[in-house]
Amino acid sequence: MIGDTVFDCVVIDEATQAPDPLLLVPLARGKVSVLAGDPNQLGPVVTGGPTVEATLASTIFDRLVTDSVMLEQQHRMHVDIMTFPSRAMYGGRLVAAPEVAAHVLADLGVRPDPARGKALWLIDTAGKDWLEQRTDFDPGGSLNNAPAFSFDPSTFNSGNAERVAAEARRLLSRGLPPTDLAIIAAYSAQARHLRELLRAERAAGLEIGTVDGFQGREKEAVIVDLVRSNDSGEIGFLANTRRMNVALTRAKRFLLVVADSATLGDHPFYAQFFQYVDEVDAHGSAWSDDAAPLE
């Protein structure tokens, strides 16, 4: 459609997600090119075997990042939500713009919840015995909306899902519009399970998905379900801190994380996260209440 047009300037957003062949086309059409993206968030989605993935996993943006400018002021997150990603991923350099540094749900007319009184809140499920399961073998087809005996390898956690659904209903009972809330599940099977539990809320505008679907997006409030809970400390691709950085930076005014510190706590990234929520006294236990809606 643009023929042989060459533009004075080409701006490519989310450039860290673009593999080289995709970037070469716009780069060839600009006298000057500006690449914008975050190398600490999701890279390109590449399929086709180990050789193809290894070839395309490193992007032009990654190779140019040493000659870049970091935008240190962010205009999305409350400072309590921002501080951990800033420390863990950006060397503590992020700064909250004055207009967002202290904004909270109450500014939107949402009733306060004294039991979750901070902009960031952790519900720790350690010791609840809400153990994860795999969907490799799903005899009822109940989690993936597929025929019985379907093969759909992913991880889900029914205990977590029930708690996350309760937390979502509690938030909505305070007057938060469903369109202002998102639930991000670490695994696709868990997202499907949550969609089943929250059908009515989804019909009203609540969004439920995985990390990949929320790159570059934001919501006033976000619940993140990290799903994994086992006796061996296995965390799978939760060890990919770039993915977790995306999940933890989508919320503007309120972020609630549901996680098992006993399973995740040996990984340095999560150990630092649990230390931070303890430092700011922003945590509760799944043992303490059932997250009933507020009257």
Where are these regions (language model features)?
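Conserved helicase motor core of SF1/SF2 NTP-dependent helicases
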Residues: M1-E295
